[in-house]
């Protein structure tokens, strides 16, 4: 039998030799992309359902994590005049890509092999939570476009959805203390890092994600 191997990602500006990385290090730049609203691993064919983040070393200022509810945004979508109704959107399939999201906020830091290894993947725009049976938007910064739509038209809509998630909801702000652990449901919640002075402070976070049960477009 194959052993289950737990994988822990380091979100950090400190290397494995405990040396602080320079501000322009590719790892630091890559992690800086986490400061935009996203759902963890939505760029994977089977996205994560749960994220577990623990603080090993925190900066004196900044370095927090914000959370926002994407279900409430869907429930209040009709509070404003909309070109597209929820009925228009309920069967939409989007493509997500970490290369797309990072190109938009950190620039092109990837080699050709990484781009080939991380192709666009399909995700539902509206997901039904398997336990609550309630729908929520599934967008965020990794969400590129809607399949079968004009690309720019769909990106305008995705921006409208992402903007409304923030405008409609209340942001829950978490300021970390060393040793704390927080977990959340990526099927309902978007999150982002708040940033910190990477040239001055050290930050070491360990993250584990729990894979979902299937690709969202098959749910």
Regions found by a protein language model. Name each.
Residues 1-183, 187-219:
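Fe(II)/2-oxoglutarate oxygenase catalytic core
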């Amino acid at each position: 039998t194959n052993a289950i191997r737990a994988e822990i990602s380091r979100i950090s500006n400190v290397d494995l030799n405990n040396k602080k990385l320079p501000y322009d290090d590719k790892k630091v730049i890559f992690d800086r992309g986490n400061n935009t609203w996203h759902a963890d691993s939505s760029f994977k064919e089977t996205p994560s359902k749960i994220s577990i983040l623990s603080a090993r070393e925190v900066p004196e200022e900044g370095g927090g994590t914000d959370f926002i509810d994407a279900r409430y945004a869907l429930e209040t979508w009709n509070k404003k005049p909309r070109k597209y109704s929820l009925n228009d959107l309920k069967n939409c399939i989007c493509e997500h890509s970490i290369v797309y999201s990072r190109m938009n906020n950190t620039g092109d830091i990837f080699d050709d092999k990484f781009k080939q290894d991380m192709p666009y993947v399909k995700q539902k725009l509206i997901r039904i939570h398997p336990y609550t049976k309630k729908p929520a938007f599934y967008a965020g910064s990794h969400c590129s476009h809607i399949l079968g739509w004009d690309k720019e038209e769909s990106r305008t809509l995705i921006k409208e959805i992402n903007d409304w998630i923030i405008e409609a909801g209340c942001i829950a702000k978490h300021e970390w203390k060393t040793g704390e652990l927080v977990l959340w449901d990526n099927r309902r919640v978007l999150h982002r890092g708040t940033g910190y002075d990477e040239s001055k402070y050290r930050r070491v976070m360990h993250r584990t994600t729990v894979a979902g049960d299937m690709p969202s477009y098959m749910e």
